[in-house]
């Protein structure tokens, strides 16, 4: 892989801007996929601020350009987008070269499809100093090479990656990258947080509930869901009598929901009939205090029957009352003489009463 693969992002710094400090991150993910016989490799570059996708470039687009993925990035002017698009196209060309080089490093034929994936970014603390810098690549899935936490050395995964490591060491690539991570990366992050302040610095608390899934051998799975939360950091734990069951539970990675929020679940297998002894605990900065949830069994069939019976009785009482009220009203209108009230030819009293009852029920409901 050529050293040019390091040139994934902008290197220009912006003047510092003021925004609420705190742990924040700026990450760029890149993917290059060769496809022999189908044209040039596809290249994609996606940027995230605090787990929110904010820019994207796709070489397969009808008009390949770096484009905003959130409204607040539309505040950037044409010069910004022209520069970002040109940077992405330069990166695309660099990755084409890298794909060819790696074929030679691994002694692979030109007929197969291969993939390079990369990530670069920075995490900052409440004082806006760098907490952690990242630069890492994978080839056809497994790790290839990564910048170490000291921001000075590299970890190469195999003999082929050693070739790249030596080239980058000779070129002083780590020093250049460290300057970017400690400087421009932090300033760009500050800039983006200022633009997206109303969205990125708000919180959406999770909507949490527990579901129940029967298993064999007298066991059930309790799954604790947290949905619709932002930012992505959240803690889900299962407890039994106050003791955390971290080793026994299945915890999935936090996933984007597609609407700017996130979702996550934690599952635990428990004995049938003992579900109420287990509690799920949810911690998120959008919550005034942590949530504690148990599985709530649905009402029994007997309870449903009682509810239905009560509703039927109430309905019958209401209908009878409406019919009586109608008859009383008609009697008053005829001076109390029932003989003046006659049915339409061919009608039956029960049908007429039922129709009028329906009208009265509808009208009274509308006036409520």
Swiss-Prot record:
Organism domain of life: Eukaryota
PROSITE patterns registered for this protein in UniProt: IG_LIKE (PS50835), IG_MHC (PS00290)
Extracellular compartment spans: 22-303
Renumbered residue ranges of the record's region Connecting peptide: 296-303
SUPFAM superfamilies: Immunoglobulin (SSF48726), MHC antigen-recognition domain (SSF54452)
One Pfam family of this chain: MHC_I_C
Region span, Alpha-2: 112-203
Region annotation (Alpha-3) ranges: 204-295
Predominant localisation class: membrane
Location in the cell: Membrane
Modification Phosphoserine, positions: 350, 353
Record's signal peptide: 1-21
Disulfide bonds: 122-185, 224-280
Domain Ig-like C1-type: 206-294
Keywords on record: Disulfide bond, Glycoprotein, Immunity, Membrane, MHC I, Phosphoprotein, Signal, Transmembrane, Transmembrane helix
Region (Alpha-1) location: 22-111
Spans through the membrane: 304-330
Family the entry assigns: Belongs to the MHC class I family.
Subunit organization: Heterodimer of an alpha chain and a beta chain (beta-2-microglobulin).
Name assigned to this protein: H-2 class I histocompatibility antigen, D-P alpha chain
Organism: Mus musculus (Mouse)
Name of the gene encoding the protein in the UniProt record: H2-D1
């Amino acid at each position: 892989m050529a050293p040019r693969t390091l040139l994934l992002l902008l290197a220009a710094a912006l003047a510092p801007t003021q925004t609420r400090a705190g742990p924040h991150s700026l990450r760029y993910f890149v993917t290059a996929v060769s496809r022999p016989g189908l044209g040039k490799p596809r290249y994609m570059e996606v940027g995230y601020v605090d787990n929110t996708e904010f820019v994207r470039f796709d070489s397969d687009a009808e008009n390949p350009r770096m484009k905003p993925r959130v409204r607040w990035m539309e505040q950037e002017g044409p010069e910004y987008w022209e520069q970002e698009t040109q940077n992405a196209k330069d990166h695309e060309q660099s990755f084409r070269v890298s794909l060819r080089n790696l074929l030679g490093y691994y002694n692979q034929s030109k007929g197969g499809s291969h993939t390079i994936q990369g990530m670069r970014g920075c995490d900052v603390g409440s004082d806006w100093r760098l907490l952690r810098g990242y630069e890492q690549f994978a080839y056809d899935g497994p790790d290839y090479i990564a910048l170490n936490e000291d921001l000075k050395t590299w970890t190469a995964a195999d003999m082929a990656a050693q070739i790249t490591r030596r080239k980058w060491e000779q070129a002083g690539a780590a020093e250049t990258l460290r300057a970017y991570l400690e400087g421009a990366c932090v300033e760009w992050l500050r800039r983006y947080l200022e633009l997206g302040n109303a969205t990125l610095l708000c919180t959406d608390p999770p909507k949490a509930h527990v579901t129940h899934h029967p298993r064999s051998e007298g066991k059930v799975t309790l799954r604790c869901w947290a949905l619709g939360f932002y930012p992505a950091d959240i803690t889900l734990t299962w407890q039994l009598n106050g003791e955390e069951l971290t080793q026994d539970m299945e915890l999935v990675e936090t996933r984007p929901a597609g609407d700017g929020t996130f979702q996550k679940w934690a599952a635990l297998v428990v004995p049938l009939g003992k579900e109420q002894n287990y509690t799920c605990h949810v911690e998120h900065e959008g919550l005034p205090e942590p949530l504690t949830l148990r599985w709530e069994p649905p009402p029994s069939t007997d309870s449903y029957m009682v509810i239905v019976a009560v509703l039927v009785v109430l309905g019958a009482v209401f209908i009878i009352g409406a019919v009586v009220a109608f008859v009383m009203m008609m009697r008053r209108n005829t001076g109390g003489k029932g003989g003046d009230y006659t049915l339409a030819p061919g009608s039956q009293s029960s049908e007429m009463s039922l129709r009028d009852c329906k009208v009265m029920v509808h009208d009274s409901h509308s006036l409520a």
